[in-house]
Amino acid sequence: MDGIKLVNVSKFYTVEKESIKVLNGIDLNIPANKITVILGRSGCGKTTLLRLVSGLEEFDQGEILGTNSKRKAYVFQEDRLMPWLDVKKNITFGIHNKNIDNRKIDRIIETVGLKKFYSAYPRQLSGGMKQRVSIARAFAYDPDFIMMDEPFSALDFFTREQMQNELLKIHQTSKCSILFVTHSIDEALILGDKIVILEKGVIKSQYEIKEKSSTRDLLDDKFVKLKKQIIDDLKVI
């Protein structure tokens, strides 16, 4: 499967009759079968970029190549579950193929730690469990490409770490492409095969990480230096 390519993509919003450029001339290659992380501060255009690639919004200039033939799924910051459906029915909701592979669904449910909550309803789940359902639903759709908009930002540190590990585990078996938005540098370093720094609607820098996620040590000199460089890129004081 080929990746996705953005060529000179710009997006404008009109606020009180004034045109504001939210994204400005974005050139970006999103590689296939990898996790590409978009990192930046609030208001830099991360979510807008995600929505353009997903097709939820239209861009005003440029081209986005390679999306038409791809099956896409989206994981939002909030869970967006159906309160009247149990865990399994929420996960299979929207899968129109009547020949659902129940063994595959069961494997996904087990991978994200929901085996004991198979028949539970959203009101019975914690925030972390609800996001597990959202992620399982995205992968159950068997997509080529998943967009994730800060899906772990509302979780506590320990749950967030668990979710990162579970995402990496399930990605290993699916090998789909993921475009992941975050404002956490550590999260970007843990998850990203490619890290894209976005600032005020433009790409400031890009980094590729060759090490497997399972072997990364953020206290290693290489990652300490990379984190410092990213902090400098973001002008974080």
Spans of features found by a protein language model:
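Hydrophobic anchor residue at the start of the ABC signature
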Residues: 135
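A short, proline-enriched helix->beta-strand linker immediately N-terminal to the Walker B motif
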Residues: 140-144
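Helix-to-loop junction immediately C-terminal to a conserved catalytic motif
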Residues: 54
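Conserved ABC ATPase "signature" region
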Residues: 100-117, 169
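Conserved ABC ATPase signature
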Residues: 121-125, 129
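Catalytic Walker B motif of ABC-type/P-loop ATPase nucleotide-binding domains
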Residues: 146-149
